[in-house]
Amino acid sequence: LLVLLLTIVAATSVNAQKLHPLRKLQLAEMAISQLYVDTVNQQKLVEDAIRGMLKELDPHSLYSTAKETKALNEPLNGSFDGIGVQFSMVEDTLLIIQPVSKGPSEKVGILAGDRIITVADTAISGVKMERSEIMRRLRGPRGSKIKLGIKRRGVDELLYFNVTRAKIPVYSVDAYYMIRPRVGYIRIGSFGATTYAEFMKAVDTLQTQGMRDLIIDLQENGGGYLQAAVKIIEEFLQKNDLIVYTEGRAQRRMEYRATGKGRLTKGKVYVLVNEYSASAAEILAGAMQDQDRGTIIGRRSFGKGLVQRPIDFEDGSMIRLTIAHYYTPSGRCIQKPYAKGDQEDYAMDIEKRFKHGELYSADSIHFADSLKYQTLRRHRTVYGGGGIMPDVFVPLDTTQFTLLHRQIAARSLIINATLRYVDQHRQELKSRYTAFDDFYNNYTVPQSMTDSIFAEAERLKLKAYSKEECDKTLPMLKVQLKALIARDIWDMNEYYRIMNEQNRIVQKAVEIATK
């Protein structure tokens, strides 16, 4: 075998110019596997080779293992099988924030504030178990049972519950409510399998409450399924209006057009984006802008306009290969420029925008004449070159989230303080504030809570800590704490109702919508 391999390798070196590139790769893998001085992991060797090839193409072509593929797809699939709880880890213990409404845990009597101590008679509390391992133990096939040992405040002994795992929904519409009379607000966190149905349910609810105009919040929306975005856009456009088209070297132009069956062709629409709005979110914003159907408010979006085709392998792993570009109806390419193989420079783009002042001033952004396009109805000037440039620019406000605020958030001081506080005062808060509006109007975060956070920041010797920085941080910290407490008592809808009153992009949309 050794002689044979040496002969093959020798022949390869002599006939290198005639050798097919794929054959060269096969021979290299064979030689390493059979001749290398130490034992090698053949699977990892192949996976690294695939990743190496894709790395030289573009920033979004990628390879994922079976485990990674499942993790990538799960948030977009609309559901998973599990016990149905929202939880957070507090001092090595799983604290239940909320059981999913009508989910398997709620049905057997598990409550918000309960702590899961054992799973199938195995301790998961106080053993420094990885979060991923805890989730693996809690999840399982639909219909299977799991025994949970629960510690409940005020009860000395452990309580045991047998929970039957079930299909647990994963929602992509984070919040919807009437933000002002006649003006509805819907926040879409991502575009998944159930996003369109969730969106239309929100629309139906808001219309019964008097909605005429709509704010669609796509801030921090990283994208997802193209078809989910297309179906939502169709609701706003006339028959045969172009939504988006794709085109690539080996892919002919493919157009997506409105069917003309939309229910939202009247009323004003405001689409909110920022530098983290990407992909399907940019397709929605670009179509609404180019068709003059909506006003785009915020900051230039991320600029991810590459079409990926999934190529599945038998072991569950996958390649997502870029096969085309997305173009808005006016012909703008959404994808921002990149150098092949230089993913580090691409990853630094947002930081570059920050340093160059683009996030603070629209005047710092300069477009060449070749990047100017016209909208299809009013013939307004819009710009290509990567991302969607808003019609109304809203600068980033660095005074809201100070450096100290970011540092204490990164250390989980804010979320941990909230969890401890709600755990201690849950029943008191529920009894005192039976309705969210009462909480919204009358609740004030206690000074002891913010004092304890700043004291911990001082103890940890955070670099940004100072009395002056604490004073600057306090107003927004109190807003965030109030919003997190509302989330833990009610849900994400109430969280955004509080946070949005301080969100400059949302407030600019409200200002324009109520003129």
Question: For each of these PLM feature ranges, what is it?
Answer:
Residues 1-19:
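Bacterial Sec-dependent N-terminal signal peptides
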Residues 27, 44-48, 52, 231, ...:
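Amphipathic alpha-helical interaction segments
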Residues 36-97, 143-175, 499-510, 515:
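Extended, small/polar residue-biased N-terminal targeting/export presequences
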Residues 113-115:
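Structural motif
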Residues 280, 292, 299, 303-371:
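Polar, glycine-rich mid-to-C-terminal structural blocks
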Residues 15-21, 25, 29-42, 65, ...:
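Cleft-lining beta-strand/loop regions that shape enzyme active-site pockets
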Residues 333-334, 338-515:
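Conserved functional hotspot residues or short segments at active or partner-binding sites
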